[in-house]
Structure formats: structure tokens, C-alpha cells
From Swiss-Prot:
Disulfide bonds: none annotated. HAMAP family: Leu_tRNA_synth_A (MF_00049_A). One of its GO terms (biological process) is leucyl-tRNA aminoacylation. It is an enzyme of class 6 (ligase). A motif ('KMSKS' region) lies at residues 638-642. ATP binds at residue 641. Keywords: Aminoacyl-tRNA synthetase, ATP-binding, Cytoplasm, Ligase, Nucleotide-binding, Protein biosynthesis. This is Leucine--tRNA ligase. It is found in: Cytoplasm. It catalyses: tRNA(Leu) + L-leucine + ATP = L-leucyl-tRNA(Leu) + AMP + diphosphate. Signal peptide: none annotated.
Length: 946
């Protein structure tokens, strides 16, 4: 631990004790006072939280602290998520003696051998990391109300979740049936993002299978996402070196890759008859079920046996990979199917040749494929003459009947409509089927097993596909604030594609499904409205309510206002006043004002949060805002246990101290951006905080009581502007911008001020207090220490947001002086070796005010001599926008007095003595005839050269 880190840790521990003693972060309802209720996603205690968690919690903490300064009654609570498999899986792996995982936990988290031995018990593991993570949050300086802490296996919480699920079931939003889910073959259970390594949500997609048949009756089920292109198939591809099988599936003998047969076995009955290499099937001919054409089976090593069925159809007119491969073979045959504005008959050929792609191994084929597929899907229309290729092998009248259907629903239709039609038609005609797959594979369970898709029977699902529910969810997304705004489109897209989602499983910690024994509610389903539970758990415990008293009627009254307190209280055996007190607590804090989490939770938790709120709560209790921050990298790399580069939050605090760490996580990137945490930057920020500390000490120790000067007024005005910009940044959750303003720009202003004055004034101390209050949300312990040094009363954490008023005249004086210094330095005589500078001030400020934004006539009418008026107007036009604005706002300005006040500053900047004269003073010497050259804010300058 460095000396700097030690200093910051000692400061932090001091103020953490004092906050806890004063219960600064344990608010109670205060009717009539505005409230701000913010939550961040609670962590799984399957490891100590790391700096990625720390960033999310810091954003929430900064928002909470800022609102407290604005006068809000702020609630920021925290809990721990024990539910599901993340904890159980790690405990099982450790119990099994997995050396790699055990070494990871020792090296990354510093777990002792004794504790490792006990971690085969999932509850011990959870409680160990729960304690470590909570300690890390406290050391990090999060202003959390720990009096509301709970875990998701607490009996009170389980009663709450059972109430939630009964509500969803009674509204028809929980169903039982057949549906594809992500599945762990080892644990025989459905999985979601929180059950997988790296929290990767299994994305389930659907292939259309098209049954091509060879002369022996073997079926080659090509898997495609573009079934509308089947009339243009010229061949099919098989990987000659891959492992294939002949298997019975859906009453047919099929050729499948061995891997595909395994994956399909979770979706239906698959019986492997024999194994084979792919080359056994190369050279055969198969019948296209739509066109009746016999097409060859070609070998292609680019076919991935782990994708689809390992059997691929080739459409070279509309698939760049197929065109390039067949061109390499000299076997190109092009059949046009789709018209797209801006492309010719054969889009794939056109794009491949335009991009200069030379072979089927060219990486540019990926880009070519994206272009063609996107253009055809969004703007493509199936050609009318495609009908002539349909079913020529069928006898009449079947041929005409099929063609009539295709003419009506396929030819001339947009690609999207044609795709839907032909997928359905193939299945109904027995010429094709469906296969589900993990489209973002590989996805691994936390146990290390690769996830597959299983079609479950009699599984419980939350039906996020229900249309009315989707519409309410969209309505909330449109009404609420989402930061960053660009994330709104991702929420709407997620709402669109969400369908049934498995909500219960048969293993893991959690809440039993209330109406069906043997099922446990899964972790992404029991964590959607728990923000409401924070508002009441403290009162439930304080009033001594037992879990069995937390009935459906209890929750209906507390959260929905249904029934009367007297009747409900009588039935559950509590005091009606106690029940009303719990209801008032919820009613005061809800709705949630801001939900903070990582952007990776948009496709699951955050969208489920939206769905469940609109399903259960009345509109006035719907959440108001979501903030989704980016990831945290470390030294340019993604953090992962396998790389051993995960930085636990408690270790980071010990390494840098909490406030330098907070400053770095705030300043390194804006909220929506991914943040690259670098050691060098953390150390720079630590040094910057020490510079601020030394500056504030100097200011406090040397300040004197005296009349305010131009310099004092300038300091207050500059600080007022910095604080206004910081306030605007905080309000928009632009933490980086706020941190730059407060940690660097404000420090530069105070440093310059101290360089200009002999002794700082007491008003400078007041300006520093204002600065410290604005700093507090980012570096709270450090701010408290500075607040104490400056003589602030109470806590900086609870001080009101400062009200400093900028003085436009003081700002104008400083801008004027800086312009003068620049003018002098640009004069050749100064550069040649100035010995002394004489400055002649024209005090007719009103002439300049008249000239700004006006014309020569206005300047003359204000009293300016005609021979000067044109120069005045030209000078006014040359001033920067800020200075022009200040001149328009400042009615009276004593240029001579301002310059006298800044004389020491000017002499220091120029490095020579400076004499200041009034241009209209007859007693002043007219050196070089510069009296008449002076204009308001543009003095005459004479330089004596030595």
C-alpha cells in the first residue's frame, strides 16, 4: 500500500464511521419533502464484487449524493441475490476439487485454504462473499441505507415473490406448455444469462429445415435462415472431413452432422443408425422439394458441422459465399429470384466482383454477405417469374394448384412475407421442419457444459409474448427517461422479440413456485420488482411481522391499496396502525426514480423490470428512469477469471484509496461508454487530489478578512460558472464532464487566484466551500476532510447545493486583462527586450457598449469622436463572443480600477514593471503618443526597450 493510498484510506475510515454514527444515509419518509429513490442491481455473492460493479454503484451513488444536495430525501438501498445457480454451481465445482477454479479464487479474491474447504457449502460461500462485498461497498464510500438490506432467500422476500407470481398467474401471464429454452445438459435445467459464464444470454434462433432427398430415400435437411431462396438452389454443401450420422428423426432417415444430431436430440427423438464421414455423401444427387430438380452434393470445408445441421443449400445468385465457392470450382449456375433496387439480376455476383473478392477464403465475404442479405431483406421483392420454377415435377392438377398458391403468397411479395409463407408451407407439406439453435454460440453454463436448445414439455413460462403486455411495456419505455437515449431502441427491440421465457427450475436456491411443488423460481424472474421490497422490509422487521403473516392480502393492501387496513390487519393478526405505517412507507418512496445497471442487462433483467412493473403496479407507480452504463476493461482488456485480471473492488480500494478510485471511475469515460481502467490514470488522479488538498490547506491557513477586490469577485464568478456546468452535467448523468470541471478546471481557477493575490480573502474560503460541496458526490470522504479544514458546519454530504452568483463585471475585468497581456506580448518591441510597459486607459466604456452589435453612428451618438468610431466598431467585432456578451450585460465598468487591481498579475505575466495611466489625465506623460491610440478595453501601449 502506497503512502498516498494509506492517507486516503485513513481519511475515508474516519468519515465512514461518522456517517454511520449519524445515520446520514438512513432516511425516513418526510411528507411534503421531495424524495429521490434510486437502486442499482444487487450482486450475486459468488465472488467479491469487482470494479465493474463498482462503476455501476458509483454512478448511482453520485446521483444519490447530488440529489441530496438539491434538498431531496434520498434513499439508496442494497441487497444480495442468492437465488439461482451461480452460487450453487461454484460451490459444486469447488467441492469437486476443481484445481483451476480453486486457484482462481485464491489468486483473484485471496480466499484462504480454510475458507476454500468450507465453500463446498453454497450458503457458506454466499455468506462469505456477501460479507466481503458489503465491506467493499462501505470502504468504497457508497452512501447506502444498510438498514434495508436483505437476501433473496430471506423468508419475507420469498413471500413477496410468491405474491408477485400469483399476480402474474391470475392475469394469465404465466403459462405451462411446450417451448424452446436454453438448456444445460449436465444439470438438466433451463438457463438464462445469470447461469452462464460471462453472463451471456443464450440467444435462441430458428432454422428452417428443407428436406432434399437422394435416390436411396435419405433426407438431407438443409438448415437455412433464407428459405425463400430455395427455388434458386444449384447444389448443396457437406464438409467432407466432418463427422456425420445417418439418424432417424421425425420418421425419416436423415444425414446430419454428428453434432447436429446431438443438439436435435433435445428437441425430438433422434436415433443414430450409423456414423460416417461427410465425404461419403459427396457426389450424390438430391431432389429439390420445391422445384423438382436434381442437384449435386458438393464438398465444402467451410461448412461448420456445429452450425445448423451441417448440411447447407447453395444459392449462388443471392449468397456471396456460394457464388465465390462455385466460381473457384468453375461450376457457377445463377438463378435469379429477388429484385432489389440498385442491384442487377445477380446481387451476390455483383457485390463479390465489385469488392474484388478473389476466392472463397477472402474475409471480405462476410461484409459482402451482410450487404446482400440486408438489402434483400429490407428492400427485396420476389420475382414474379419464380412461379415457373415451382413444382414442375408434380402431375396436374397438383402442379397448377401449388403454383396458384405461390403466385398469391410468394411471387411479387416482399422477402419478409415470402419467407414466412414458405417456411409455413414447407412444414405443412411435410417438405421441411424447424430446428432451434443457440445463435450466439458457444454459450457455457457456469459448470462448463455448452448450452443447447431443448424443447420443454410442461414447463412454466412467463409469457412476455402477450400482445397487450408488450404494448404496456412499450408505453413505459416511451414515457420514461433512458440514459443513454440510444438505448431506447434496444429496449424496444428486446420487447419485440421477447416471447415465453422459462421462469422456474428444479434446482438451485430460491423461492418455491407457490402452486406447483418441486419448482423453484429462477433468478431473472425473482428480481424484477424487488425495488418495492426495499421500501417496506425495514418496517416489517421493526414491527415484528412474521413471514406467515405476509399473505396475499397483506401485499395487496401495502402495494396496491386494495382492501381496508382494519380488515386485513384482523385477518393476519397485526395492529391496523402498523399496516398503515408500512403502506405509507411504500407510498412515499414509490415510484422508483432511477434504476441503474450495466448495459448487458438490457436484453434481460432491465426489460423484465419494465414488463413486471406495468403488469403489477398502477401507472402512477411505474419507474421513471433507467441508467445503463458501459463495461469496465482493465488496461485495455476485458476482465475475466481465466486471464486472472479481475480487480476486486476491495483490492482496488486498498491499492489506490477509495476517492482516487472513485475519481478514476468517474472521469475515465461517460456513462454510456466502456471504461478502460488504467493504473497510471488512477495514480494521476491521486496526485491531483493531493494538489487540491494542499491548495485548500494553504487557502484556509492564509485567508484574511478584507474588502473584496476584483480578483476575489473574479474567483467567485469563475467558480460559480464551474459549479453551474457541473450541476448541469450531474443532472444529465455526465459524470466525466462533472469530474473534469470539479477535479481539474476548478483547481486551475483557485491555483491562478492564489498566484495573483498576496493573501486570499475570506470570500475565497466561501468559494472553496461551495467547490467542496460540488465535489462531494464524486470524492465524498475527501470532500468531508476539506469541508472540515475550511470550517464547514455539519457534513458536506448534507450541505445544500451552493448558490454562487457570478459578477459579469469581474469576469469582464479578467478577460480584459488577459487580452491586454496577449496584445503586449504580440508587439515586436516587447519581444525585442522590453524594459518597462506603459498602459493608457480610455475610460469611455459607454462608447464601446454602443459599438457592440451596432454601427459607427451609434458609437458617435454615444459620444465617441468620429475619427475613433470606426475603430471602435471594428474592435467590437473582433472581440470573442464571450467578451461581447459580457460588455452587453455590464452597464458600468471602471477599466482603470480593474487594471490597477490586476497590476501584480500583469507584471508577473509580462516580466517587467508596468505603469498605468488614464488617457485623459493631462498630468500623465504621453509616451510615444499612445494616449490618443487608447480605446475602451483596448488601451494604448508603449514599450520601453532596454
Amino acid at each position: 500500500m502506497s503512502e498516498l493510498a494509506k492517507f486516503f484510506i485513513e481519511v475515508a475510515e474516519k468519515w465512514q464511521r461518522r456517517w454511520a454514527e449519524a445515520k446520514v444515509f438512513e432516511p425516513s419518509p418526510q411528507p411534503g419533502r421531495p424524495k429521490f429513490f434510486i437502486t442499482a442491481a444487487y450482486p450475486y455473492p459468488n465472488g467479491t464484487i469487482h470494479i465493474g460493479h463498482g462503476r455501476t454503484y458509483l454512478v448511482a451513488d453520485v446521483m444519490a449524493r447530488f440529489r441530496r444536495h438539491l434538498g431531496y430525501n434520498v434513499l439508496f438501498p442494497m441487497a444480495f441475490h442468492y437465488t439461482g445457480t451461480p452460487i450453487l454451481t461454484i460451490a459444486e465445482v469447488i467441492a469437486a476439487g476443481d484445481k483451476a477454479v480453486i486457484e482462481e479464487y485464491k489468486e483473484i479474491y485471496g480466499v484462504s485454504d480454510d475458507d476454500i474447504k468450507k465453500m463446498g457449502d453454497p450458503l457458506y460461500l454466499a455468506q462469505y462473499f456477501h460479507r466481503r462485498s458489503k465491506e467493499a461497498m462501505i470502504k468504497f464510500g457508497l452512501g447506502i441505507d444498510w438498514s434495508r438490506e436483505f437476501t433473496t432467500i430471506d423468508p419475507e422476500y420469498q413471500r413477496f415473490i410468491q405474491w408477485q407470481f400469483e399476480k402474474l398467474r391470475k392475469r394469465g401471464l404465466i403459462v405451462r406448455g411446450r417451448h424452446p429454452v436454453g438448456w444445460c445438459p449436465r444439470h438438466q435445467m433451463p438457463v438464462g444469462a445469470h447461469d452462464t459464464k460471462d453472463d451471456k444470454e443464450p440467444e435462441i434462433g430458428q432454422w428452417t429445415l428443407i428436406y432434399f432427398v437422394d435416390g436411396e430415400g435419405l433426407v438431407y435437411p438443409t438448415a437455412t435462415l433464407r428459405p425463400e431462396t430455395v427455388p434458386g438452389v444449384t447444389n448443396i454443401w457437406i464438409n467432407p472431413d466432418a463427422e456425420y450420422v445417418v439418424a432417424e428423426f421425425e420418421g425419416r432417415k436423415m444425414v446430419l452432422s454428428k453434432d447436429a444430431a446431438y443438439r436435435l436430440s433435445f428437441q425430438g427423438n433422434v436415433k443414430v443408425i450409423r456414423e460416417a464421414r461427410g465425404r461419403e455423401f459427396v457426389g450424390r444427387r438430391v431432389l429439390n422439394p420445391v422445384t423438382g430438380e436434381w442437384v449435386p452434393v458438393y464438398e465444402a470445408k467451410f461448412v461448420d458441422p456445429k452450425v445448423g445441421t451441417g448440411v447447407v443449400m447453395s444459392v449462388p445468385a443471392h449468397a456471396p459465399y456460394d457464388y465465390a465457392a462455385l466460381r473457384d470450382m468453375g461450376e457457377v449456375k445463377l438463378i435469379p429470384l429477388i429484385r432489389v433496387e440498385g442491384y442487377g439480376e445477380y446481387p451476390a455476383k455483383e457485390v463479390v466482383e465489385r469488392m474484388g473478392i478473389k476466392s472463397q477464403t477472402d474475409p471480405a465475404l462476410e461484409e459482402a454477405t451482410r450487404e446482400v442479405y440486408s438489402a434483400e431483406y429490407t428492400r427485396g421483392v420476389v420475382r414474379e417469374d419464380v412461379v415457373d420454377r415451382i413444382a414442375p415435377h408434380l402431375p396436374e392438377p397438383a402442379r397448377s394448384m401449388v403454383r396458384a398458391v405461390f403466385k398469391l403468397y410468394f411471387a411479387g411479395r416482399p422477402v419478409k412475407e415470402a419467407r414466412e409463407f414458405i417456411s409455413k408451407w414447407l412444414a405443412e407439406a411435410g417438405l421441411g421442419g424447424v430446428m432451434y439453435d443457440i445463435m450466439n454460440k458457444p454459450v457455457y453454463c457456469r459448470c462448463g457444459t455448452e448450452i443447447v436448445v431443448k424443447v420443454l414439455e410442461d414447463q412454466w413460462f412467463i409469457n412476455y409474448g402477450e400482445r397487450g403486455w408488450k404494448q404496456l411495456a412499450r408505453q413505459l419505455v416511451e414515457e420514461m427517461a433512458i440514459i443513454p437515449q440510444e438505448a431506447k431502441a434496444q429496449f424496444l427491440a428486446t420487447i419485440d422479440w421477447l416471447d415465453k421465457r422459462a421462469c422456474a427450475r428444479t434446482r438451485g436456491l430460491g423461492t418455491p413456485l407457490p402452486w406447483s411443488q418441486g419448482w423453484v423460481i429462477e433468478s431473472l424472474s425473482d428480481s424484477t420488482i424487488y425495488m418495492a421490497f426495499y421500501t417496506v422490509i425495514k418496517k416489517i422487521r421493526a414491527l415484528g411481522l412474521r413471514p406467515e403473516q405476509l399473505t396475499e392480502e397483506f401485499w395487496d393492501y401495502v402495494f396496491l391499496g386494495q382492501g381496508s387496513a382494519a380488515e386485513v390487519a384482523k385477518r393476519i393478526g397485526v395492529d391496523p396502525a402498523a399496516l398503515e405505517e408500512i403502506r405509507r412507507e411504500f407510498d412515499y418512496w414509490y415510484p422508483l426514480d432511477s434504476r441503474n445497471s450495466g448495459k448487458d442487462l438490457i436484453p434481460n433483467h432491465l426489460t423484465f423490470f419494465i414488463f413486471n412493473h406495468v403488469a403489477i403496479f398502477p401507472r402512477e407507480k411505474w419507474p421513471r428512469q433507467i441508467v445503463a452504463n458501459g463495461w469496465v476493461l482493465r488496461e485495455g482488456e476485458k476482465m475475466s477469471k481465466s486471464k486472472r485480471n479481475v480487480l476486486p473492488l476491495d483490492k482496488a480500494v486498498a491499492l489506490y484509496g477509495p476517492d482516487p478510485l472513485r475519481a478514476t471511475l468517474a472521469i475515465a469515460a461517460e456513462v454510456e461508454q466502456d471504461l478502460d481502467f488504467r493504473d497510471a490514470e488512477a495514480r494521476r488522479n491521486s496526485q491531483q487530489l493531493m494538489s487540491i488538498y494542499n491548495l485548500v490547506q494553504r487557502l484556509a491557513q492564509s485567508a484574511v478578512e478584507r474588502e473584496e477586490t476584483w480578483l476575489d469577485k473574479w474567483l467567485i464568478s469563475e467558480v460559480a460558472h464551474v459549479l453551474e456546468r457541473a450541476r448541469e452535467a450531474y443532472e444529465k448523468v455526465r459524470l466525466r464532464q462533472a469530474a473534469v470541471e470539479l477535479l481539474y478546471n476548478a483547481e486551475a481557477v483557485f491555483s491562478q487566484y492564489l498566484s495573483m493575490v498576496d493573501k486570499p480573502s475570506k470570500s475565497a474560503v466561501e468559494a472553496a466551500k461551495a467547490w467542496v460541496v460540488a465535489l462531494e458526490p464524486i470524492v465524498p470522504h475527501f470532500a468531508e476532510e476539506l469541508w472540515q479544514i475550511l470550517g464547514g458546519e455539519g457534513f458536506a454530504a448534507t450541505a445544500p447545493w451552493p448558490k454562487l452568483s457570478p459578477d459579469p463585471a469581474a469576469l469582464l475585468a479578467k478577460r480584459y486583462v488577459d487580452m491586454l497581456i496577449e496584445d503586449v506580448k504580440n508587439i515586436p518591441a516587447y519581444k525585442a527586450g522590453a524594459k518597462r510597459v506603459a498602459i493608457y486607459v480610455n475610460g469611455n466604456y459607454q462608447w464601446l457598449r454602443a459599438a457592440v452589435g451596432k454601427d459607427v453612428k451609434a458609437a458617435i451618438e454615444a459620444g465617441a469622436p468620429p475619427q475613433l468610431a470606426k475603430r471602435l466598431v471594428d474592435f467590437a467585432k473582433s472581440m470573442g463572443e464571450e467578451v461581447r456578451g459580457l460588455v452587453e450585460r455590464v452597464e458600468q465598468f471602471d477599466e482603470y480600477a480593474a487594471l490597477q487591481s490586476y497590476k501584480r498579475y500583469v507584471e508577473k505575466a509580462l516580466g517587467v514593471p508596468v505603469d498605468i495611466y488614464k488617457a485623459d489625465d493631462p498630468q500623465a506623460p504621453d509616451l510615444g503618443g499612445k494616449k490618443k491610440a487608447a480605446l475602451p478595453l483596448k488601451p494604448g501601449i508603449f514599450i520601453e526597450v532596454g
